[in-house]
């Protein structure tokens, strides 16, 4: 036919059998990728330390999505929360991956069958004998079926009525687990961080989809609307489908980047805003203050801070610190976290407690400044070797550790104090193993960052695709010179021009 690469899809423009075939093949590719990617991730995933080396630090992308839907165990005998599992059952990580690959194979065979047997009776209008698809009716069928699936997911899977429930975390990502969810029907259900809204919204949206599907199956569109919106043209379907996809992609990019009940930090890592707002730091200080109010020592209170909570309060886990095009997992960047050294408390020679000003998200370097409780600068580490009235040496800064591996240890040596002040810029201080993975020390983003970037980028591209195909279908006769009422199967590389009966036509 001599079609350019960007026009090859016109071969299925008015060939319903092969249009169906290529869509089944697309489903096969998507399911096959998901299953294969899951098996690859399971082959490289190390489940031994769910606190300091969780899935998101290891760059896992599909495992978190399986986990949030209720899959927590592996046929390898491990569970996502640590420990061993004796009876993981059919729906383990490997079971889900295998089901996707098997489904992919069946779709592959179905696609081949429909490509070979494309000329089916069902695709012909019995009144005219010409190939025809009743697109409004097909829309109704799809809307009804997707409504059933949506309702079923919300009413059965999420609620635990027939299914495991979904992953639910506390606000600080410490005690998350899979559990059934009760639908939330009040205004609080619209809070993106309330899991009950997931159940209620799927039930409501599914009900609406079922009713809308039945409506479109039983009511025909008016002729003017049918012609005005080009409801008989398959490119109208393409345009509106792209609109649905780009809208969904924009929404999930937002829920992933800003955080929501659907994207728990235990599975996808913390958001950048939790670092920007000192979210975990505030909770840590709240717990410490509560302990001190009960007459516990600093050492006791800091020792009770969960290592998991302290690890969230480290800038290396901020998804905005990794460059978009730095390949690899977070572990390939700053290394594998081995242990929390403890919380450093700095004091000057007058006994004032000093706080290291933390590095903002979008800085690669930042001056090391120590301020007192009133925010007054008391010490710093100058960029140049220079005399400074605020220097660590002149101010006599010391550091003492509470909690963690260095609990009770203090240092007054200026070089050591500066080293820990520099590290305290980055939040809580952790020992990091860079040797195992040959980590380069340059921060990487988490799957939260990749997912957001990918979906926002494709949403933008698909937005332009929607405009393009929408314009083409609305103004097809103007743009292409193709008769909008053309229903013969023609070879679209040799165009049938509007008003030109001499243009070569070839029946399919």
Curated annotation (Swiss-Prot):
GO molecular function list: chlorophyll binding; electron transporter, transferring electrons within the cyclic electron transport pathway of photosynthesis activity
Keywords from the UniProt entry: Chlorophyll, Chromophore, Membrane, Photosynthesis, Photosystem II, Plastid, Transmembrane, Transmembrane helix
Compartments, as annotated in UniProt: Plastid membrane
Main location (coarse class): plastid
Pfam family, one: PSII
CC annotations in GO: photosystem II; plastid membrane; thylakoid membrane
Transmembrane portions of the chain: 21-36, 101-115, 140-156, 203-218, 237-252, 457-472
InterPro entries xrefs: PS_antenna-like (IPR000932), PS_II_antenna-like_sf (IPR036001), PSII_PsbB (IPR017486)
Family in the record: Belongs to the PsbB/PsbC family. PsbB subfamily.
Protein's recorded name: Photosystem II CP47 reaction center protein
Organism in which the protein naturally occurs: Cuscuta reflexa (Southern Asian dodder)
Gene from which the chain derives: psbB
């Amino acid at each position: 036919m001599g079609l350019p690469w960007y026009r090859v899809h016109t071969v299925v423009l008015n060939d319903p059998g092969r249009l169906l075939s290529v869509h089944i093949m697309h489903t096969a590719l998507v399911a096959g990728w998901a299953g294969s990617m899951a098996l690859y991730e399971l082959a490289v995933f190390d489940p031994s330390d769910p606190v300091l080396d969780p899935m998101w630090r290891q760059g896992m992308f599909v495992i978190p999505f399986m986990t949030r839907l209720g899959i927590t165990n592996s046929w390898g005998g491990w569970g996502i929360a640590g420990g061993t599992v004796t009876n993981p059952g059919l729906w383990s990580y490997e079971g889900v991956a295998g089901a996707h690959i098997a489904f992919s194979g069946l779709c592959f065979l179905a696609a081949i069958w429909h490509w070979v047997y494309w000329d089916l009776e069902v695709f012909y209008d019995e009144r005219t004998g010409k190939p025809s698809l009743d697109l409004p009716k097909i829309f109704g069928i799809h809307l009804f079926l997707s409504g059933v699936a949506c309702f079923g997911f919300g009413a059965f899977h999420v609620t635990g009525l027939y299914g495991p429930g979904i992953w639910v975390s506390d606000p600080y990502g410490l005690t998350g687990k899979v559990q059934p969810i009760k639908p939330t029907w009040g205004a609080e259900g619209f809070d993106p961080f309330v899991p009950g809204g997931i159940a209620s919204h799927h039930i409501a949206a599914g009900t609406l989809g079922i009713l809308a599907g039945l409506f479109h199956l039983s009511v025909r569109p008016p002729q003017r609307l049918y012609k005005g919106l080009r409801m008989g043209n398959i490119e109208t379907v393409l345009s509106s489908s792209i609109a649905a996809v780009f809208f969904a992609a924009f929404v999930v990019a937002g829920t992933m980047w800003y955080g929501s009940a659907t994207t728990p930090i235990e599975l996808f890592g913390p958001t950048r805003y939790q670092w920007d707002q000192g979210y975990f730091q505030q909770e840590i200080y709240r717990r410490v203050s509560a302990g001190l109010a009960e007459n516990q020592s600093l050492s006791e209170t800091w020792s009770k801070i969960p290592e998991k909570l302290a690890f969230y309060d480290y800038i290396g886990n901020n998804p905005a610190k990794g460059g978009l095009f730095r390949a690899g997992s977070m572990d390939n960047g700053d290394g594998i976290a081995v242990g929390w050294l403890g919380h450093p408390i700095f004091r000057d020679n007058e006994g004032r407690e000093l706080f290291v000003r933390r590095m903002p998200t979008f800085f690669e370097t930042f001056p090391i400044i120590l301020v007192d409780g009133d925010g007054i600068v008391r010490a710093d580490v100058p960029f140049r070797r220079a005399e400074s009235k605020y220097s660590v040496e002149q101010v006599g800064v010391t550091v003492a550790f509470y909690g963690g591996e260095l609990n009770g240890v203090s240092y007054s040596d200026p070089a050591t104090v500066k080293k820990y002040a520099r590290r305290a810029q980055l939040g809580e201080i952790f020992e990091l193993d860079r040797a195992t993975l040959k980590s380069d020390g340059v921060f990487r983003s988490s799957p939260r960052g990749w997912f957001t970037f990918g979906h926002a980028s494709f949403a933008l591209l698909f937005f332009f695709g929607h405009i393009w195909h929408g314009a083409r279908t609305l103004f097809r006769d103007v743009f292409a010179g193709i008769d909008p009422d053309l229903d013969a199967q023609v070879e679209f590389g040799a165009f049938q021009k509007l008003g030109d009966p001499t243009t070569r036509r070839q029946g399919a």
